[in-house]
Amino acid sequence: MLTVLSPCFASAEWASLPRHRADWDDATMDGRGASKREQKAAMRAAVLAARRAMPAAARAEAASSLTAAVLTLPEVMTARIVAVYVSIGTEPPTAELLDVLRSRDARVMVPVLREDLDLDWAIYETREQLSPGAHGVWAPEGPRLGVDAVADADVVLVPALAVGADGARLGRGGGSYDRALARVPAGRPRTALLYDGELLPGVPAEPHDQRVTGVVTPSGARHLVDGGP
């Protein structure tokens, strides 16, 4: 049974992070506080430290629960084309999810990181076709669909380090998914996959940062905002 997450929640490891969006607003380098860029860097470091401390058994359990939660989403179950990332490192795992989506006859597109950090796309068939590409990101062999192919997806599932209750997404800082999500038509679901505890009251955001419309964690899913930029 799907658990709908409360509007904002946080576990104990987030106690050291600012709890309200106002804590991040309009701080500058003039002595009043850290810049948005510095705030993002601090939050990234905290999230990554918490993820690295997660036991392997907990990560494996999270993978199964995350897959189950994603598959309860109507927009995923009815999608003809799903765009989803190939997880690496401490990202919420997608290996199981990719195979399940493929077994349901959905057309599964995965990102191919380019040298300029933009995202091309390719069709996922099996794990065996994956090989490490730019910056160690795994991608399929075969034809590239172009950076605009993500606009054809009925739903886009993206990685994130944290998401605010208003849909603001904290990524790795390269801007890859900001560029990709900017190509997704308004109204299309764009959902971030997270671990429990990573949906926060607010995260620092800048004008170019693209928002997500919902999140899925091992504990369930939550709709945040309607589709749009």
Regions from the PLM with identified roles:
Residues 86, 160, 219:
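Glycine-rich, N-terminal phosphate-binding loop of Rossmann-like dinucleotide-binding domains
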